C-alpha cells in the first residue's frame, strides 16, 4: 500500500544439485565431461554385474539399449576387461610352472562377450509419441541379432539408459528375447 518493498531470506539456501536428467540427457554428447561421466557410470556397474551373473563370463553376453547407452557400455566393457586381465594374471601366476602351452593360450584368449543384441530402426523416435500409440510403436522399433545368445545357457546383461520413460526394455526388447 505504501509502495515500499524489501528483500529478506525466508528459507536457508540448500546445496545446488544438478538433476541427472538435465545434466546428461540434455547435454551435448560430445561434451568431454559428460562422456567421462557416462563411462564412469558403466564402470561403476561392474561389481554388481559380476555378482549378479555369479562371475560367469563364459556364459554372459553384454550389450546396450538404446544407442545413448553406448558410452556407459564402453565404461562397463573397460571395467570388465580390467577384471578379466587381473583374473588371467592370477591364473597364470598360480600355475606358471605347470602351464602347458594350450592352457596358456586358452587363458590368454579369454574375452568379454560383447554383442549388439538389439538393433533399433533409427527413423522411429518413441519418446515423442503418447499412450497406446507409443506402446504399439515401441513394440516394433527394435529387432534382435539372432544367434548372438545361446538359449537357456547365456546370461544377457544390457545397459539401458532410457531415462525419459524407462520402458524400452519392458515394451520393446524383453518380448522379442523370449
PLM features per residue range, with description:
Residues 1-178:
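PRPP-associated nucleotide enzymes
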Amino acid at each position: 500500500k505504501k509502495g515500499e518493498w524489501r528483500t529478506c531470506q525466508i528459507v536457508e539456501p540448500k546445496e545446488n544439485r544438478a538433476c541427472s536428467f538435465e545434466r546428461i540427457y540434455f547435454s551435448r554428447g560430445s561434451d568431454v565431461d559428460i562422456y567421462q561421466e557416462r563411462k564412469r557410470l558403466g564402470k561403476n556397474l561392474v561389481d554388481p554385474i559380476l555378482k549378479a551373473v555369479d562371475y560367469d563370463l563364459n556364459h554372459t553376453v553384454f550389450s546396450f539399449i538404446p544407442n545413448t547407452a553406448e558410452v556407459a557400455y564402453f565404461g562397463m566393457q573397460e571395467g570388465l576387461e580390467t577384471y578379466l586381465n587381473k583374473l588371467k594374471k592370477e591364473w597364470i601366476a598360480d600355475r606358471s610352472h605347470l602351464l602347458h602351452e594350450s592352457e596358456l593360450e586358452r587363458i590368454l584368449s579369454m574375452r568379454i562377450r560383447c554383442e549388439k543384441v538389439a538393433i533399433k530402426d533409427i527413423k522411429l523416435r518413441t519418446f515423442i509419441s503418447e499412450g497406446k500409440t507409443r506402446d504399439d510403436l515401441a513394440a516394433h522399433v527394435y529387432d534382435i541379432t539372432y544367434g548372438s545368445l545361446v538359449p537357456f545357457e547365456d546370461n544377457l546383461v544390457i545397459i539401458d539408459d532410457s531415462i525419459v520413460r524407462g520402458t524400452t526394455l519392458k515394451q520393446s526388447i524383453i518380448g522379442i528375447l523370449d
